[in-house]
Every structure is written in C-alpha cells, then in structure tokens.
A protein has these predicted regions:
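Acidic, glycine-rich A-domain
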Residues: 57, 77, 83-87
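Hydrophobic, small-residue-rich alpha-helical packing segments that form membrane-like cores
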Residues: 67-68
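Alpha-helical scaffold elements adjacent to nucleotide-binding pockets in ATP/GTP-utilizing enzyme cores
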Residues: 15-22, 64, 90, 156
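Active-site nucleophile and cofactor-binding loops and adjacent substrate-binding regions
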Residues: 4-13, 42-44, 76-79
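Thiamine diphosphate
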Residues: 33-38, 43-63, 91-301
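Glycine-rich phosphate/pyrophosphate-binding loops
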Residues: 1-16, 26-27, 33-34, 170-173, ...
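Loop/helix-junction capping segments adjacent to catalytic residues or to phosphate/diphosphate-binding pockets
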Residues: 9-13, 85, 150-151
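Inter-helical turn/loop segments and adjacent helix faces that build the functional surface
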Residues: 29, 72-74
Length: 301
C-alpha cells in the first residue's frame, strides 16, 4: 500500500504509468501480471488540505490515472468507512492493477451499509434509496463523485425535499466503469445497462453532477450518462486557500447552495422558492457565507 497526500501524488504519475502500460501489454498477450494489485491512497485531499494554500490542493493524479486504461488503472472515491473497507476487500482479490483511492482523512458519517457498499463496489455506482424525493417520477438526477461532494449533494437534496422537488440521488465510486470503452479490456469492466438505467431513470431529463475532480474531465468520461439529457457539472475549478472543507466547497461553487441554484436553473424554478433572502445575498456575493451557507451549526466538516 502506498499512501500520500493528494497534491504530492502528481509527482508519482510517471512511474505509475509505466507499470500500467507494462501490465496492459502482459494482459493483451495472454500473460497477465500476477502481482497483487496495489492501492495508491490519496488522502489529506484537495478539499480538506488548507494548510499550505492552493499548492496542496490538486486532484491531478486521480484525473491522470482515470485517463489511463480503466481495466488496469482503476480510480475510486470511497465515501465512508464501509465503502473504503469494501474497496480494499475487493482490491486484494485482483492482480496486476493499480487502484488510485481518493479517501478523506477526516471523520465522515457512515453513509452506506455493508450491503450497500458491496453493491456500490460491484457495480461502480448506486442510486441511494434513502435520499431523494419521489425518485421514480423525478426529472432530475443528482450524482456525486467524492465523499465531500456527496455530503453537499445530500444537504441540497434535503432542501429540495422540503420544497417538494422530485429528484433522485446517486453516488459513483468508480467513474471509469461508466465511460465509453476504448479497448477490449475496458469493455469487460463497464457496468451493466441496468445500473446505468437505475442511476439515471427513464423519467430523468436533467443531470447535476458534483465531482471531487475538475468537472470537465468527468463530463467527457461519463458521456453515456448524459445522452439525451441536459447536464451541469460542478467540481474543482482551481480555487483554494487556507480554507476548511465548507470554504473550499463554497469558493469552487460546490456547496449545497450552489448545487441548489443550478438545479433551479435546469428545472426553471424561481430562486425565491428554494432560498431565503439572506441565502440569495450570500450567493450573489453581498454577504459572508459563514452562518448562512457554511458553519450553520458552528461545525466544520
């Protein structure tokens, strides 16, 4: 197991890529590598490492590894204790792969049961049945990639439920399994059509995705989920500083309030329906978010 803080991981890409290429070549000639798959753990991650400002806020390694062939270079975003434990259980049953695992170092609520975690890892993603509102008829799907992103999506979902806005919530732990396969090996790892349809139900016309990474990468990688739908993607937009997690979410436009604002745009809902006057002033840059959007209960994630 290799463990590093996420920003330093960018320096490790060159060597990791050579191992991926060699393992891929072995697989293609029918002599797959027999070494036990290696977890490359990226923690003290982009959204929680405010000690050294923007220099230590960089999701580049996960992005680069996701660009490599997904049957050898597997990139996962475990969201809590159970999904992280299940990730390691499944990882050590494979050979010849590098698993890049983006994992928070801070305490995260247990969001998935053990059974849900197995389903999540087996399929690469899951629709969260206990979240959302009137999901079967919802016109919009909220999709999170990354633990802190899921927490903000769930906050937005709670407000949407209060306002009677139908929606469903899903989590993708392994985005590479939802891409258009670029080779035969990747095609073997793509998740089933049933999972695709469960995450974006037939009634869904819009998708709001929030990613740990820069949003552009996921927009390209997850093309099959967007087909025939309007989509808005949020994620890291190179803004940072000596901020806590909620502060990072806010400056990068990934807070629950920013998510809710984009949902309103997609569904043509007036902001006055979902926001208070104070919240709208914050989103318009006229007030500090503290105590309104962030740090509502004097708690930091």
């Amino acid at each position: 197991m290799i463990v590093t803080y996420e920003a330093f991981g960018a320096k490790m890409f060159g060597g990791s890529r050579q191992e991926i290429i060699f393992s891929k070549h072995q697989k293609e000639i029918g002599k797959p590598a027999k070494w036990l798959s290696v977890p490359l753990v990226l923690t003290s991650n982009t959204w929680e490492n405010g000690k050294n400002e923007l220099s230590h806020q960089d999701p580049s390694l996960a992005e680069s590894m996701l660009s490599e062939t997904s049957d050898i270079s597997r990139v996962l975003f475990p969201a809590d204790y159970n999904s992280a434990a299940e990730t390691l259980t499944q990882l050590y049953q494979t050979q010849g792969q590098i698993w890049t695992l983006v994992i928070p170092k801070r305490k995260i609520p247990v969001l998935f049961s053990m059974d849900e975690s197995k389903k999540l890892l087996t399929n690469g993603g899951i629709r969260i049945d206990w979240a959302g509102h009137e999901a079967d008829t919802a016109l919009i799907s909220l999709i999170a990639i990354g633990a802190y992103q899921l927490l903000e999506v769930l906050k937005a979902s709670s407000r949407m439920k209060e306002c009677g806005i139908a929606h469903n919530v899903s989590y993708l732990v392994e985005p590479g399994r939802f891409r258009v396969p670029r080779n035969r090996g990747e095609a073997e790892y793509i998740t089933s059509e049933t999972v695709f349809n469960d995450i974006c139900l037939p009634s869904c016309r819009h998708v709001l995705m929030v990613s740990h990474t820069r949003p552009e990468l996921m927009l390209g990688t997850l093309q099959p989920l967007w087909t025939g739908r309007s989509v808005k993607a949020l994620g890291f937009i190179n803004k940072g500083g000596t901020l806590d997690v909620e502060g990072m979410n806010f400056v990068n436009g990934c807070s629950w309030a920013h998510i809710l604002r984009e949902v309103g745009k997609l569904l043509s809902i007036n902001e006055e329906v979902v926001f208070s006057d104070l919240e709208r002033q914050v989103l318009n840059g006229n007030l500090s978010p503290d105590g309104v959007i962030t740090k509502i209960n004097n708690k930091e994630i």
